[in-house]
Every structure is written in C-alpha cells, then in structure tokens.
Amino acid sequence: MKIGVFIPIGNNGWLISETAPQYKPTFELNKTIVQKAEHYHFDFALSMIKLRGFGGKTEFWEHNMESFTLMAGLAAVTSRIQLYATAATLVMPPAIVARMAATIDSISNGRFGVNVVTGWQKPEYEQMGMWPGDDYFTRRYDYLTEYVSVLRDLWGTGHCTLDGEFFKMDDCRVSPRPQSEMKVICAGQSDAGMAFSAKHADFNFCFGKGVNTPTAFAPTAARMKTAADAENRDVSSYVLFMVIADETDEAARAKWELYKAGADAEALSWLTDQSSKDTRSGSDTNVRQMADPTSAVNINMGTLVGSWASVARMLDEIDTVPGAGGVLLTFDDFVEGIENFGRYIQPLMKTRQHIGIEQKEVA
C-alpha cells in the first residue's frame, strides 16, 4: 500500500481549531516534513492550492503558499519521493502549467505529477475577477476535460492544436518535454468527478469517513472502480486520513477531544456557507462532506485516533478494501507526527513490511 503526506501549505494544516497547533506555512517547515517523509520511505507528497481562507479566530487557511513553486523547491532538496503540485485550473492556463510541470520534472529527475482541481470556493476567484459564473458548477468537468487534453498533448507530443469550447490552441508548443510519463491525479467524489477520473486520471483521491472506521470509504472506492472498469482503465482510490496518535489510546483520544473542544466556530460557519453556494451539483461532492457538522473540525476527513499499534492496525485494514491503492495522510503535528509514524507505526504495519527490507539494503 502506497503512503503519501498531504503537506501543510496553508496555516494550521487541516484542523480548524483554536486548541490545535497554530503555525504558518514556510518552505523550511515543508522541507523538514518532506525530507522526514522521504527518510521514512513515504511514497509521495502532495500540496494543495488555496487562494482564500475561511477566516475566524484562527484565520484558517488565510495564509497559503503557492503549490508549484513550493514543490519546485522541494524537488531540489529531495531525491526519491514522488511530488505532486495542484493546479488551480481556473486561473492557470494549461500551456503554462504544462511548461511549469516539465521544468519541475527536470528539477526532480522525473518525480513530478499534477493534481488538477476545478475550484469550488467562489470567493477565491471572485476576488481577482476570474469566477466564470455559477453555471460553471455544472460545466466544470467539461472544462477540466479540455484542460487535461491540452496537458496530455503538450507533454506527449510537444505541441497542441485545439478548437475547443474553453481553449483555443494554435500549434501551441512546449519543449523540453517531461523525461517521465507525467501522472495526472484528481479528487473526484461526485458522479461527474469520478467519471472524469475514470477517463483521465492515473488515480483518484477520496475522503476517508468517520473516526476509527478505516474501511467506511469502501462504497466510494467501489463507485470509482465501477466507473474505471467501464472505461477499461485501472484507476485506484487513494484515501485521505488524519492520524492523531500517541503511546496509548487514551492519550491520543485526549488530543482529539481537545481539538474538537476548540473548534473555530466562525471559520466553520464560513465553510458551511460556501458549501451551500453550489446548488447545481449533486449531494455527493467533496465540499458537502467537508462541511458536514459531524467532524467539521478537520473537514470531515477520515480520522484515525489511537496508539501506535491501533493506528497501524487500522491502516492495514484500509488495504483490504477493493480498489484502494494507498493513503494520503495528514497529522495534527506534522513534524512530530511523521517522526512517530516512521519510528513506531510503520514498523507495525503488515502492509509496509517491505520498508524494513529496503532500509537494510540502503544501509
């Protein structure tokens, strides 16, 4: 099972809480995190893109770095780990993204890929006059399909000519091209998003569900597998979980209860309000799950709370779900969390026993 880290490109990571660790994103912080992840043989690191936050007392996600430039820097200070940046496709022309990606491919020696997002938070784009109107909610995957076709053409052949609805390319060129096949990933959870991923993505991210229910995402993975099978493609699901771990179950649970008690109500209200703006998509979108009041304090990603052994056991359970290819992890404290994961949790995981063999070979 592949394991990646969803690095904290925005302040406070993924905990919307006054009692969680409070910090701003910096290159040095993310360098430390990704280098630790590489040391402990994580398979990949992903950074999101966020152009406006949720406010509140914690100013949640009001302080964000830019994804491609951050990953370019991280590419230069790592050697093995796969790196993914996120393209905000509404404000980043595909020909420019194709060239930036090819450049980072060169910096990383072929370890780079691109996560594409359509954009759901209207104020991110309205603030710069680039929101295309609310009809976009129903057309966003049509837009993304053209966008990715431009990327694939430029990376694959070095040129693109397209007379599309959203993009006009007249012998557009990119060179040098990537030395390795450029992976495109997506996080489609709605029917439209999964249909897109089934046709165009190399793998698809989805949310884990609940607290200490590691296989509850199985119906989502099954939907993705069905959609991919219909396209005769293999598109596995990579599942997003937060790990809150300690030496004992009781100590880990105490952390989780503390974070929930300090939930930033004002920031959560903003999230709920923004999730209601899209009245045209179905009820199965990512943002609908993020705003669910059940566990909005960490945007309702799956949460694994427990001792080193408990978390290791639950992570192994994820691998039993058909269609699951890996996990994308966040932590309450990333530096400490990855260190503890590498030293205490991963050695207990049956699905990561090959790591011990690799470490001996490196030594």
Swiss-Prot record:
InterPro entries: Luciferase-like_dom, Luciferase-like_sf, Pyrimidine_monooxygenase_RutA, SsuD_RutA_monooxygenase. One of its GO terms (molecular function) is uracil oxygenase activity. It catalyses: uracil + FMNH2 + NADH + O2 = (Z)-3-ureidoacrylate + FMN + NAD(+) + H2O + H(+); thymine + FMNH2 + NADH + O2 = (Z)-2-methylureidoacrylate + FMN + NAD(+) + H2O + H(+). One of its GO terms (biological process) is nitrogen utilization. Keywords: Flavoprotein, FMN, Monooxygenase, NADP, Oxidoreductase. Belongs to the NtaA/SnaA/DszA monooxygenase family. RutA subfamily. The FMN-N(5)-oxide reacts spontaneously with NADH to produce FMN. Requires the flavin reductase RutF to regenerate FMN in vivo. This is Pyrimidine monooxygenase RutA. The gene is rutA.
